[in-house]
Amino acid sequence: MSDDAMKLVVVGAAGRMGQALIRLIHATEGLTLHAAVARPGSAFIGKDAGEIAGLGQIGIPVTDDPLSAFLHADGVIDFTTPATSVTFADLAAQARIVHVIGTTGCSAEDETRFKAAARHARIVKSGNMGLGINLLSVLVEQAARALPPADWDIEVLEMHHKHKVDAPSGTALLLGEAAAKGRGIDLGDHSVRVRDGYTGPRPAGSIGFATLRGGAVIGDHSVIFAGEGERLTLSHSAGDRSLFARGALQAALWARDKKPGLYSMLDVLGLSTR
């Protein structure tokens, strides 16, 4: 480990994403695991983070004290729950460190809290940390801008594993936001999340969402542009959860020397149009 290696905290360290992050940090030059945090009461508290991740002992015990874990760290990687991520954002702001948030299912109130924390922390937040999905979102925005809403309907279809607890997925919403941006509309005013029973005709100009859950699917997303006599489908399939971990670590390194603010993966990847 070099003296200038970025010292990262992994929260939710005992989960599948947490373990993937620990393994990848261990294998990535320029990064070092500073601390690993699990929820209070977890059976993994006190155990070696490396052993949990299948690396063997690395001398980092899992803790349930994020405040001490953030002390002297350079950044935190966070794929947890909305309420927990809000708490971590406040702590990251106090510590003036990087906070990469891959948590999905956040409310408007949560987003307001993240914006407040970003006055002092460098926050990178995205519904998906992968390069492919973020490139897809740019293509979706361009297609939505080019195809007249009177002639083309937009539907977002997603499937995830049976353990996922929020719907639509953060990635589906990211793609919906891209489509809405391309059309110059507000997604909240034009999205259709549920169809059941006698729904009547499809509302003109709406953006529909369909959610599937089952098996061990890591993440499949399609945006369908349905016109008269033709259909355009833009899609992405994730086959390995480590792609999200790689993106999160790329975001942390990118944000290290940035000024406080709320950024997205489009900023990290140089795809932002703002």
Swiss-Prot record:
(S)-2,3,4,5-tetrahydrodipicolinate binds at H161, G170, T171. Pathway: Amino-acid biosynthesis; L-lysine biosynthesis via DAP pathway; (S)-tetrahydrodipicolinate from L-aspartate: step 4/4. CDD domains: DHDPR_N (cd02274). It comes from the Bacteria. Signal peptide: none annotated. GO terms for molecular function: 4-hydroxy-tetrahydrodipicolinate reductase; NAD binding; NADP binding; oxidoreductase activity, acting on CH or CH2 groups, NAD or NADP as acceptor. Its EC number is 1.17.1.8. SUPFAM superfamilies: Glyceraldehyde-3-phosphate dehydrogenase-like, C-terminal domain (SSF55347), NAD(P)-binding Rossmann-fold domains (SSF51735). Catalyzes the conversion of 4-hydroxy-tetrahydrodipicolinate (HTPA) to tetrahydrodipicolinate. HAMAP family: DapB (MF_00102). NCBIfam families: dapB (TIGR00036). This is 4-hydroxy-tetrahydrodipicolinate reductase. It comes from Rhizobium rhizogenes (strain K84 / ATCC BAA-868) (Agrobacterium radiobacter).
